[in-house]
């Protein structure tokens, strides 16, 4: 009755109205501008659209770069994004590493290893210097062995805290002969206080 043709048309209309569509005017202008651009700018634009801006937060070591290249040779079906998730770096960084064909010669490799070792030694020396400075600063400080007292207050305050008189609590009578409370316990009124 309705036919396959009408059913397909209805499905395509449903898909058309269910998805938001971008306005066609900027796309035409963009395509006209991109046709006038040189090839390298088109390629850069396509890379930016695909991967986003290149802002590397983590750098891979040379050994990791070599591992990445060998993995790509062993598994060419893996995509750049998969490698980016594996190494936890941006896909753009992975693309640049895989695109580069530079390999160091033996002399360059020795020079790079020496530079890395000297940087490591400088870092260790800097760390040791900081530790030595902290030890010197700690040794210059003299430990306080007793309570530092001010001459103005030492005459007023008794030296031994146990020789102090017990504090008078709220509701407590000033002359207390029958009830000697421990100075550490708060005063609690009892039946005997009411009877007196």
From Swiss-Prot:
Query: Keywords on this record?
Result: Mitochondrion, Transit peptide
The listed locations are: Mitochondrion
Keyword field contains Cell inner membrane = no
Q: Which family does it belong to?
A: Belongs to the RRG9 family.
Q: Where does it sit, as one GO cellular component term? A: mitochondrion
Region (Disordered) residue spans: 19-48, 103-196
List the InterPro entries hit by this protein, alphabetically.
NGRN/Rrg9
| Function summary | Required for respiratory activity and maintenance and expression of the mitochondrial genome.
Bias (Polar residues) occurs at 29-38, 118-133
Q: Where is the transit peptide?
A: 1-22
Q: What is this protein called?
A: Required for respiratory growth protein 9, mitochondrial
PANTHER family for this protein? NEUGRIN (PTHR13475:SF3)
Superkingdom classification of source: Eukaryota
Q: Does the keyword Mitochondrion apply?
A: yes
Here the segments flagged for biased composition (Basic residues) are: 159-170
